[in-house]
Swiss-Prot record:
This is ATP synthase F(1) complex subunit alpha, mitochondrial. It comes from Mus musculus. One of its GO terms (molecular function) is proton-transporting ATP synthase activity, rotational mechanism. The modification N6-succinyllysine is found at K161, K167, K230, K239, K261, K305, K427, K498, K506, K531, K539. The record marks S413 as: Required for activity. Disulfide bonds: none annotated. The modification Omega-N-methylarginine is found at R204. The siderophore enterobactin (Ent) produced by enteric bacteria binds Fe(3+) and helps bacteria scavenge iron ions from the environment. As a consequence, the mammalian siderocalin LCN2 plays an important role in defense against bacterial infections by sequestering iron bound to microbial siderophores. LCN2 can also bind iron bound to endogenous or nutrient-derived iron chelators and plays an important role in cellular iron homeostasis. The modification Phosphothreonine is found at T134. Subunit alpha, of the mitochondrial membrane ATP synthase complex (F(1)F(0) ATP synthase or Complex V) that produces ATP from ADP in the presence of a proton gradient across the membrane which is generated by electron transport complexes of the respiratory chain. ATP synthase complex consist of a soluble F(1) head domain - the catalytic core - and a membrane F(1) domain - the membrane proton channel. These two domains are linked by a central stalk rotating inside the F(1) region and a stationary peripheral stalk.
Length: 553
């Protein structure tokens, strides 16, 4: 083969019309042909080696993984509920994704189909669309990056301030802490509202229900509580700080916007997260929002911090859950609610807890709100939530329209565990006040029928009227605990018994201004000691007496 190629090369090198070829010319042609063949051989060897290395690299770097997805198809869609065929291995409460990009959650796992609730507008889904599993249970972003933001039930920002920067996510349906990690409530959660902090005190880790008819001031108590935490969050002591989560369920968008503006004006948004599932959102989002907010609060609790979560209100969550359950063909029970509506709220509220020091010592306090119809607390949802929580603040329409605001019914309101967390100073001044007010309400009902009352009854009525006036408080004006103690001291010790009831509010404003400007050291002692010492008691008595002597109503 080699000789043939050499001969061909020599022939090409010879002149075409050569008569006689010299030996030198023939020799040089042969040498040139041999050199050409050697260079070609070297090129072939180099190309083969390079090709082999490229192929080897590609084989070693090839992605051998196979991307498998379990999919199903929509059988029917309507009223926010999709019936999906396939998805045989889907989990309960797993997130699924429709071909339109919408997300949903599998709730009903039936033999031949899966009932999926849609998180959004079901008009974007049609029969026959592909649905794929995500393999993930519904989760939301958590962390301090959410503070100051307004998010929807899935944790997506809806305040126009860009995406959430949180890298931590947490499942929305986590189990509540067990018995061992918990410890009894022992630290006060101050609302800044005199009537609450003195009569129905709340502790960190407690669940205190706010219940009443519409337009009786339920949300106002919650918002005042958030605003009052500014005095603690402005400090540097992490143990005193209280991060707040407000969950708006089924409210008007304008109402949520006003609330966010109010918190922003009070400089309270910097430590608050607002989770909004408004009336125009799908029922599944209204159902999910409280659990999403709770997961955000649990992040603080489990990291040794303190958080407060307000569910406003759980009546609307129960209605959304009833709607979903009936559309999923689950059997209805009392008031058409499904049989597990108690579990709906208990598994949510049990996640509020005070953790012991081995588990970080954090806490999550819950203030659920329930709206009653015509003051009926014996309805299904109110009785359920009353039995789950550690007490309730009961607001009455009648008191509200009488001008007693906050319109708290002292007789029906109770805090089952909060007294252990109440500051000693407040216990010293307000210990007898609840009994006095309850007796006053009872006697006042009979006093209108008779005029000849004995001196003790007249004294009880006189004191009750003045204490009721003293507990009135304007909206968005929470008070520090030491200021509350100073004002209530004047009332329960009888210094205001001679003052006209109509002058009580004026006295309170003037007295507080005087104490704050002239006796800051006394307030500081009460705040730091947590109690009224003998010296502080004597000083308070002197201040009240001297102020009343010069007070001109």
């Amino acid at each position: 083969m080699l000789s043939v190629r050499v001969a061909a090369a020599v022939a090409r090198a010879l002149p075409r019309r050569a008569g006689l070829v010299s030996k030198n010319a023939l020799g040089s042609s042969f040498v040139g042909a041999r050199n050409l063949h050697a260079s070609n051989t070297r090129l072939q060897k180099t190309g083969t080696a390079e090709m082999s290395s490229i192929l080897e690299e590609r084989i070693l770097g090839a992605d051998t993984s196979v991307d498998l997805e379990e999919t199903g198809r929509v059988l029917s869609i309507g009223d926010g509920i999709a019936r999906v065929h396939g998805l045989r291995n889907v989990q309960a409460e797993e997130m699924v994704e429709f071909s339109s990009g919408l997300k949903g959650m599998s709730l009903n796992l039936e033999p031949d189909n899966v009932g999926v609730v849609v998180f959004g507008n079901d008009k974007l889904i049609k029969e026959g669309d592909v649905v794929k599993r995500t393999g993930a249970i519904v989760d939301v972003p958590v962390g301090e990056e959410l503070l100051g933001r307004v998010v929807d039930a899935l944790g997506n920002a809806i305040d126009g301030k860009g995406p959430i920067g949180s890298k931590t996510r947490r499942r929305v349906g986590l189990k509540a802490p067990g018995i061992i990690p918990r410890i009894s409530v022992r630290e006060p959660m101050q609302t800044g509202i005199k009537a609450v902090d003195s009569l129905v005190p709340i502790g960190r880790g407690q669940r205190e229900l706010i219940i009443g008819d519409r337009q009786t001031g339920k949300t106002s108590i919650a918002i005042d509580t958030i605003i009052n935490q500014k005095r603690f969050n402005d400090g540097t002591d992490e143990k005193k700080k209280l991060y707040c989560i407000y969950v708006a369920i089924g409210q008007k968008r304008s109402t949520v916007a006003q609330l966010v503006k109010r918190l922003t004006d009070a400089d309270a948004m910097k430590y608050t997260i607002v989770v909004s599932a408004t009336a125009s959102d799908a029922a599944p989002l209204q159902y999910l929002a409280p659990y999403s907010g709770c997961s955000m609060g649990e992040y603080f609790r489990d990291n040794g911090k303190h958080a407060l979560i307000i569910y406003d209100d759980l009546s609307k969550q129960a209605v959304a859950y009833r709607q979903m359950s009936l559309l999923l063909r689950r059997p209805p029970g009392r008031e058409a609610y499904p049989g597990d509506v108690f579990y709906l709220h208990s598994r949510l509220l049990e996640r509020a807890a005070k953790m012991n020091d081995s588990f970080g010592g954090g806490s999550l306090t819950a203030l659920p709100v329930i709206e009653t119809q015509a003051g009926d607390v014996s309805a299904y949802i109110p009785t359920n939530v009353i039995s789950i929580t550690d007490g309730q603040i009961f607001l009455e329409t009648e008191l509200f329209y009488k001008g007693i605001r906050p319109a708290i019914n002292v007789g029906l309101s109770v805090s089952r565990v909060g007294s252990a967390a109440q500051t000693r100073a407040m216990k010293q001044v307000a210990g007898t006040m609840k009994l006095e007010l309850a007796q006053y309400r009872e006697v006042a009902a009979f006093a209108q029928f008779g005029s000849d009352l004995d001196a003790a009854t007249q004294q009880l009525l006189s004191r009750g009227v003045r204490l009721t006036e003293l507990l009135k408080q304007g909206q968005y004006s929470p008070m520090a605990i030491e200021e509350q103690v100073a004002v209530i001291y004047a009332g329960v010790r009888g210094y205001l018994d001679k003052l006209e009831p109509s002058k009580i509010t004026k006295f309170e404003n003037a007295f507080l201004s005087h104490v704050i400007s002239q006796h800051q050291s006394l307030l500081g002692n009460i705040r730091s000691d947590g109690k009224i010492s003998e010296q502080s008691d004597a000083k308070l008595k002197e201040i009240v007496t001297n102020f009343l002597a010069g007070f001109e109503p």
